[in-house]
């Protein structure tokens, strides 16, 4: 978390105090701001009274005619949980068993939940809805997941938002028929490489989750593909996934309920849907992954922007990146603070090791003159042409400090052509959210009127302009934001050259 010396209430600029590590409070008017996943948020409403979980851990076991296995597995689970120590509940989600599963579950004191939606995915959703624990562990009811491994998952709960018992990391193994092993490897390779996922075992059902995360997910999959969907949606939301080595053993009795044709169709459907998500700007790591994109133009653009901005910011001590997203720029300078309005992008950016703030360019939660360098790249074109954002950027910058401001130059035919082309070739990766079209001719004089001296303007791809500006002091702008907005409307109406 950034130091309280730099953070202030965005409403009144009053000082803040920390309370129990979960919120900040304004000392002037008592406004409360939550700390979410270690990130101070000035967007999310102040925290409500904490709703305590019903227990520390919920175990969720989907079951369909697994009575014989459950009669052996449930006592082993209870024994392992008692030795582990946390308060717990065991939930068995029954998909309409006809082998006495219900009686066996009641005999061993577990909670029985009747499945309403079809398939393995429906069982998961039913279990997640009923789970009362702070953490949830899912495992199979057929005995293939060793209850003794619960302690390993529980011990790793602080290492990730999701912890996977992984067969495919060093130290893991899988005892299964050769055909099934080959299919599992093909499945994991297809999803892992096809979707650029930083996970080795995507199909393991033996996992630990923070239950708060599960409540955020809008799951669609109905079969075993729900396992991949959960992980991909978790990663898209910026959460961390951790794997611990696990030795998988074959089911003790009975037969698998997977059906090959239905299995293949459901996985194909989920792969297509998740490919669209992974390659859209909605994915938390979109900015970061673009740096290494397989698309040459995207890779060139990201690296050109990174190089230009980091060179301009080098040597600065107190740096703020407004609208940092998940770009690698936030990790380029030690001690830099990143601010963005999208919390899931900030969750991903935690890996860069710098301080992060969930806030808005319209109300920056920092004291006047806090920074000797402020970066604002690819932001102002997404918001109306108003005075407030530019005033805020100037306010938090020290006199003599540098503002690095990047935005497309809509006077350049290259940008208009690229925007048109990219929007059609990769509609998921480009959102037509540019509501203000700036040009060098209208933005330069406006910034000078705001008290900035233009030190230079660099271009990425001959069309994205990056201003290097020195703050001289406050001035009354002869060019108003309204006139810039009028100019950009005229630009939008003009045909591309």
Tell me the role of every PLM-derived stretch.
Residues 1-10, 21-51, 275-367, 373, ...:
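Conserved N-terminal segment of class I S-adenosyl-L-methionine
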Residues 41-76:
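N-proximal low-complexity "stem/linker" segments adjacent to membrane-targeting elements
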Residues 48-57, 194-197, 219-296, 403, ...:
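Hydrophobic helical membrane-anchoring modules
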Residues 76-86:
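Short, acidic, metal-binding catalytic loop of nucleotide-sugar glycosyltransferases
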Residues 94-102:
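A conserved acidic beta->alpha catalytic loop
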Residues 115-130, 135-138, 144-224, 251-261, ...:
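Acceptor/aglycone-binding surface of glycosyltransferases and processive sugar-polymer synthases
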Residues 376-379:
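A short beta-strand submotif of the Rossmann-like class I SAM-dependent methyltransferase core
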Residues 387-399:
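A short glycine-rich, Lys/Arg-flanked "PGG" loop and its adjoining helix->strand segment in the class I
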């Amino acid at each position: 978390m950034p130091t309280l010396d730099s953070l202030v209430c965005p409403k009144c600029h009053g000082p803040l105090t920390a309370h129990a590590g979960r919120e900040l409070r304004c000392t002037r008017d008592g406004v409360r701001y939550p700390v979410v996943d270690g990130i101070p948020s000035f967007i999310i409403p102040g925290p409500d009274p904490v709703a305590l979980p019903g227990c520390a851990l919920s175990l969720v076991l989907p079951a369909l005619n697994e009575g014989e296995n459950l009669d052996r597995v449930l006592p082993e689970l209870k024994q392992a949980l008692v030795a582990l120590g946390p308060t717990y509940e065991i939930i068995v989600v029954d998909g309409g068993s006809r082998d006495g599963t219900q009686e066996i579950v009641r005999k061993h004191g577990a909670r029985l939940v009747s499945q309403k939606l079809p398939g393995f995915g429906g069982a998961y959703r039913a279990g997640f809805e009923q789970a009362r624990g702070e953490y949830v562990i899912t495992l199979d009811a057929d005995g293939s997941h060793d209850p003794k491994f619960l302690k390993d998952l529980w011990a790793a709960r602080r290492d990730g938002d999701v912890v996977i018992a992984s067969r495919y990391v060093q130290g893991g193994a899988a005892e299964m028929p050769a055909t099934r092993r080959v299919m599992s490897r093909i499945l994991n390779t297809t999803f892992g490489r096809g979707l650029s996922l930083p996970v080795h075992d995507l199909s393991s059902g033996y996992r630990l989750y923070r239950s708060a995360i599960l409540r955020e997910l809008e799951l669609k999959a109905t079969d075993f593909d729900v396992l991949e969907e959960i992980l991909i949606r978790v990663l898209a939301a910026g959460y961390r996934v951790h794997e611990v080595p696990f030795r998988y053993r074959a089911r003790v009795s009975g037969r698998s309920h997977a059906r090959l044709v239905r299995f293949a169709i459901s996985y194909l459907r989920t792969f297509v849907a998740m490919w669209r998500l992974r390659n859209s700007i909605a994915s938390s790591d979109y900015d970061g992954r673009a740096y290494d994109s397989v698309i040459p133009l995207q890779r060139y653009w990201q690296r050109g922007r990174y190089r230009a901005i980091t060179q301009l910011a080098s040597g600065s001590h107190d740096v703020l990146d407004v609208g940092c997203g998940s770009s690698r720029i936030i990790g380029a300078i030690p001690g830099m603070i990143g601010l963005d309005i999208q919390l899931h992008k900030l969750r991903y950016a935690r890996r860069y090791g710098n301080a992060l703030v969930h806030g808005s360019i319209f109300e920056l939660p920092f004291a006047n003159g806090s920074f000797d360098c402020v970066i604002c790249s690819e932001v102002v074109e997404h918001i109306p042409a108003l005075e407030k954002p530019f005033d805020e950027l100037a306010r938090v910058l020290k006199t003599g400090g540098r503002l690095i401001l990047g935005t497309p130059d809509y006077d350049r035919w290259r940008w208009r052509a690229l925007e048109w082309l990219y929007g059609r070739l990769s509609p998921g990766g480009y959102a037509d959210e540019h509501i203000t079209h700036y040009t060098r001719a209208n933005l330069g004089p406006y910034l000078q009127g705001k008290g900035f001296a233009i030190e230079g303007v660099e271009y990425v791809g001959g069309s994205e302009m990056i201003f290097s500006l020195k703050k001289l002091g406050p001035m009354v702008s002869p060019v108003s934001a309204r006139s810039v907005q009028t100019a950009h409307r005229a630009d939008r109406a003009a045909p591309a050259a």
